[in-house]
UniProtKB/Swiss-Prot annotation:
HAMAP family: MFS_YhhS. It holds the Pfam family MFS_1. The chain crosses the membrane at residues 23-43, 52-72, 90-110, 121-141, 158-178, 180-200, 228-248, 255-275, 282-302, 309-329, 351-371, 375-395. This is Uncharacterized MFS-type transporter PA1993. GO terms for molecular function: transmembrane transporter activity. Keywords: Cell inner membrane, Cell membrane, Membrane, Transmembrane, Transmembrane helix, Transport. Disulfide bonds: none annotated. It is found in: Cell inner membrane. PANTHER family: MAJOR FACILITATOR SUPERFAMILY MFS_1, RESISTANCE PROTEIN MDTM, PUTATIVE-RELATED-RELATED. GO terms for cellular component: plasma membrane. Belongs to the major facilitator superfamily. YhhS family. Its main location: membrane.
Length: 402
């Protein structure tokens, strides 16, 4: 007589809730870290252009410099995560976020000397970019260390919800803080958030260090490059909407472009909450193929939209499709390296989304100058289809024996 020892559905529900709580308790550091990124996002260009009196090029440089710093710091972040542990990396990142807030406070204090004020601001942006490279990847590594590798997709999905949600909340929060309290409140809030994150991380139990061979970063980068390229091609659609949707709507004489950003963000988060487990069931490549197909359809709707409501539907579909592209390719990428190199793999893989978002603005802007604003979304659709084709090729390669 056999005895069924499988857990009952309530026990399974309890186990799932426990895993989710453990993940959320760690990815909250990503939320705090990205909140420090979102708060100055909508304020700094105006501060540099209007208050310090510099041109639009420098105003844009202040924003993009942070992404460049994140890109360059990825290899170092991977070494810290793998060598010292994710908790230590989070602590370093939170300290860096607080330090960047101090540089922003200094910039406001010496506003009467525009060159010095700008220099202080630029240093702060570099420090914040380096801090971002530590916190985001470390939170994923910490979460996987706590709940186990089988839940990698769920950890990455929740981490993405935390990062995108924090930026969406931080940007309007920064505007309100400056309107109510003045420019100093922007730097002060970042200092306080960094200190809060440090204080919350300090007493938490670290994830156990995984011992083993540490591969050189360029070896890890070579292994994850095909997956990163698929991610980069998919991210062009997101970058195009985030950067140019307001100009596109204005060129068509349509109002309420901000609704597209809300629809994109809402569907992005909703899909991650509802379908994160599909990666474990179907595999990363299958999910990437489906998601990039949906994203391509959304971008095609934006390109061909006869009215703003079709454009809104296109933005929603694009957000829904892009939602699982990062974790879908990411799960397959992380599986290519030993567990002792997980941090390096996450850093190398994330580098591609930094690169994609960094070049999307000028590249898609060039396309718009040549062919008009509508053409941007056709270009992004073709890029997404390129990512889909790459996912199909990787899936076929993974099924070959040996």
């Amino acid at each position: 007589m056999s005895v069924d020892i499988r857990p009952t559905p309530p026990a399974q529900d309890s186990a799932r809730q426990n895993v989710t709580l453990q993940i959320v308790s760690v990815v909250m550091f990503t939320f705090i870290g990205y909140l420090t990124i979102g708060i100055p996002l909508a304020v700094l260009p105006g501060y540099v252009h209007d208050d310090l009196g510099y041109g639009s090029v420098l105003a844009g440089l202040v924003i993009s410099l942070q992404y460049l710093a994140t890109l360059l710091a990825r290899p170092y972040a991977g070494r810290v995560i793998d060598g010292l542990g994710p908790k230590r990396a989070v602590l370093y990142g939170m300290a860096g976020s607080a330090a960047s807030g101090l540089f922003m406070l200094l910039s406001v204090a010496i506003q009467g000397w525009p060159a010095l004020s700008l220099a202080s601001l630029l240093v702060g942006r570099l420090v914040l970019g380096a801090a971002e490279s530590l916190v985001g990847s470390a939170a994923i590594g910490w979460g996987i260390g706590r709940v186990g590798a089988p839940h990698t997709a769920k950890v990455i999905s929740w981490n993405g919800i935390a990062s995108y949600g924090a930026i969406a909340l931080g940007a309007p929060l920064g505007v309100l803080l400056v309107q109510w309290l003045g420019l100093w409140s922007m730097g002060a809030s970042i200092v306080l958030l960094g200190a809060l994150g440090f204080a919350l991380a300090w007493p938490k139990l670290p994830a156990p260090l995984v011992h083993g061979e540490r591969l050189p970063f360029h070896h890890v980068l070579g292994r994850v490059t095909p997956h990163g390229m698929g991610l980069a091609l998919g991210a062009i659609g997101f970058g195009t909407i985030a950067t140019f949707i307001t100009l596109y709507y204005a060129s068509r004489g349509w109002a309420n472009a901000v609704l597209c950003l809300s629809a994109f963000g809402g569907c992005f988060i909703g899909a991650r909450l509802l379908f994160a487990n599909s990666i474990n069931r179907l595999g990363g490549f299958r999910v990437a193929i489906i998601c990039l197909g949906v994203e391509s359809l959304g971008l095609l709707l934006l390109w061909s939209a006869p009215n703003p409501w079709v454009g809104l539907a296109g933005a929603a579909l694009t957000g829904f499709g892009f939602s699982l592209v990062f974790p879908a390719f990411g799960v397959e990428a992380v599986n290519l390296v030993p567990a002792s190199n997980r941090g390096a793999a996450l850093g190398a893989y994330s580098l591609f989304v930094d690169l994609s978002l960094g070049i999307t603005g000028p590249l898609v802007g060039f396309v718009a100058n040549l062919f008009g604003f509508r053409s941007m979304f056709l270009f992004a659709c073709l890029a997404s289809l390129g990512g889909l084709a790459l996912a199909v090729a990787l899936h076929r390669r993974s099924r070959r024996p040996g």
